[in-house]
């Protein structure tokens, strides 16, 4: 099955502590059904000092489950579901089901 969420997509968080936040997808992990979204689901990690980096408490993004993410509609900015359609020239593109606007292509 084709990926509905890809790297670089603008997404909206649907549930959890960051509900309503918007961000760009940094990476997608299809085997885990998770994605890394910039500036969302921030967690603190305690890191040991190494020869290259100093130790301390570091804040970074954690993965978010794909079921808690929706693509941002290019027209309205609201969360939307994603569909696929084939254009006249034979290309398969994603489109926002709410507005019918193509997401890529």
From Swiss-Prot:
InterPro entries named among the record's database cross-references: KOW, Rib_uL2_dom2, Ribosomal_uL24, Ribosomal_uL24_CS, Ribosomal_uL24_KOW, Translation_prot_SH3-like_sf
Keyword GTP-binding assigned: no
SUPFAM superfamilies referenced in this protein's UniProt entry, alphabetically: Translation proteins SH3-like domain
Cystine pairs: none
Name of one Pfam family that matches: ribosomal_L24
Keywords: Ribonucleoprotein, Ribosomal protein, RNA-binding, rRNA-binding
GO biological process: translation
Superkingdom, taxonomy of origin: Bacteria
An example Gene Ontology molecular-function term: rRNA binding
GO cellular component: ribonucleoprotein complex; ribosome
Similarity comment text for this entry: Belongs to the universal ribosomal protein uL24 family.
Complex formation: Part of the 50S ribosomal subunit.
Known function: One of two assembly initiator proteins, it binds directly to the 5'-end of the 23S rRNA, where it nucleates assembly of the 50S subunit.
Protein name as it appears in the record: Large ribosomal subunit protein uL24
Classification of source organism: Bacteria, Pseudomonadati, Pseudomonadota, Alphaproteobacteria, Hyphomicrobiales
